[in-house]
Amino acid sequence: MSEPVEFLDLDDLVDMARILLGDPPPIRDIGLLGSAAARPQTTVGGRDAYPTMWSKAAALLQSVVDNHALVDGNKRLGWLATAVFLEINDASVAGATDDEVFDLVWAIASARSTIEEIAHHLEMMSGRRS
């Protein structure tokens, strides 16, 4: 049996935004930020919509980047939240290069990446293979 996944919540994202972007954080829509925090936990018919840790991380990253809950800093917060989510679940993308991060986050912001593609990139950045 695998370890339970530890999720970030809305308060975690607000705290990260405050640290990253200043106090008060530039929140445009708190509901959209809450939605982004909740998305990795989504279930459909009693099953996880995002069954792997990587797909959960991908859902978080895509939602924070694309929901535009902040006036500014959505991409930066998305990456930070994803890196923290993975760290608290015993994975790491700390070895990812700035170019890898930039390319992935911009592909998401440009609506060019699926959850599966994002999850794959995150897993490759971690050095893990499933």
Q: Positions of the model-derived regions?
A:
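FIC/Doc superfamily catalytic core
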Residues: 1-130
